[in-house]
Amino acid sequence: MAINSSGTKVLSFVRSVWQDFVNTNGFDAHVVSDIQIISAVPGFVECSLKLQKHHLNRMGNLHGGCIAALTDLGGSLALASRGLFISGVSIDMNQTFLQSGGTLGSSILLHAKCDRLGSNIAFTSVDFLTSSNEVFAKGRHTKFVRNALGDPRNCLDLAED
């Protein structure tokens, strides 16, 4: 279910963090630069992605490696929704594939959640949904955030408007 939060401080901040990913021109910018951030509230971000050829495996389905990259990105954006500009470093990440996620031209949704943000460790989860809102994969991401919490670009006082 989409959360309509257009224009909020949280959505603006999350989009600015995503723009920094793109501007850095690293891995995320090359693999999933066309992701759209639909909504964001503290602790939750919803994104969509229209699948292109470079997102697919040789069988024409969404590649598991792309789902892993999106788990990483989704976790980072969920932490951005809590005010972190830099989201720390990965400790552990896993994905569970329930069914094929889509083919060329189909759109998927990501529901990224910050399950817990502590003073050292953060836990995030991402549900991957088809355009008909069926969950086809789940991702979990644990990050070390202690150093990230001190970044001057953080906006740790984000709250819903």
From Swiss-Prot:
Official protein name in the record: Putative esterase C31F10.02
Assigned keywords, A-Z: Hydrolase
InterPro entries the record matches: ACOT13, HotDog_dom_sf, Thioestr_dom
Entry's Gene Ontology molecular function annotations: fatty acyl-CoA hydrolase activity
Domain of life: Eukaryota
First-level EC class: hydrolase
Biological-process GO terms, alphabetical: acyl-CoA metabolic process; fatty acid biosynthetic process
Pfam families with a match to the protein in the record: 4HBT
GO cellular component: cytosol; nucleus
Entry EC no(s): 3.1.2.-
Naturally occurring in which organism (per UniProt): Schizosaccharomyces pombe (strain 972 / ATCC 24843) (Fission yeast)
SUPFAM superfamilies per UniProt: Thioesterase/thiol ester dehydrase-isomerase
